[in-house]
Amino acid sequence: MKVNKKITAMLLSAVIAAAPAAAPIMDVQTVAAATTTTKTLKNAWSKNHKYYYDKNGKKVTGVKKIGKYTYVFAKNGKLVTNKKYYKYNAKTYYKIAKNGRAKKLSAVETLAAIRLKKCGGNLKKAFNWSSSVRYAGNYKVAKKNVANYAKYGFQTGRGDCYVQAATFYQMAKVAGYDAKYVKGSVNKGKGLAPHAWVEIKSNGKTYVYDPNFQSEFGKKGYTGYKITYGQKGTLLYVKTSKGR
């Protein structure tokens, strides 16, 4: 009997050893992941609307016109949004809305943006720069308008009240303020004289910004920054234009 049991045990061991190993059960999720492929986006926006992919499926960088609108993408491909004056390169600036739609600044707006950037985007520093423009009454511009006055001031650092007001107006507009360039006259004690200044509306009130007044009377303790019409220590302003 013992011999038979030994033989039986040996035969069972041989059968088990010869049997093929059971195949491992692969996780169903692993199989699904292995067989799923990600669709490459081409000429399309990403789901979060932060990136745009070109015809080769690569992220777009730089300036790109998509449909009717222009957009600017950073070096990493991310859409640039909500910038009052975005520096694309040394000579090109864009105003970019919250949805990313971009508008290239004009030549005079670009000059204003460059100067404003040097002022750290600070309105008071921009005003001080305009009031520091050296007085020059004998100058020529192609056409006497706010754009040409401002260009002359930014390019030469010289000019009169029209130029000083024009440079500040352009910087205030680029910075996003509700600004108007105003022409008229003021009384400096010797009758009315032609003059120009800037109005900015803020919280329902209209304030006057007069860089020329600041340059003339600032050292005497007076200010032309954010004053109101009729304020003590200021000029009598008479408007002849509605501003722009």
Identify the role of each PLM range.
Residues 4-13, 17-114, 184-199, 203, ...:
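Extracellular adhesion/carbohydrate-binding repeat motifs centered on closely spaced tryptophans
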Residues 105-153:
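Secondary-structure boundary elements
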Residues 122, 157, 192-194:
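Generic hydrophobic secondary-structure packing signal
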Residues 126, 157-172:
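Active-site nucleophilic cysteine motif
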Residues 153-157, 187-190:
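A glycine-rich, coil/turn loop motif that links secondary-structure elements
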Residues 166-232:
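Hydrophobic/aromatic-rich core segments of domains that either
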Residues 229-244:
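Short, low-complexity, Pro/Ser/Thr/Gly-rich segments in the mature regions of secreted, periplasmic
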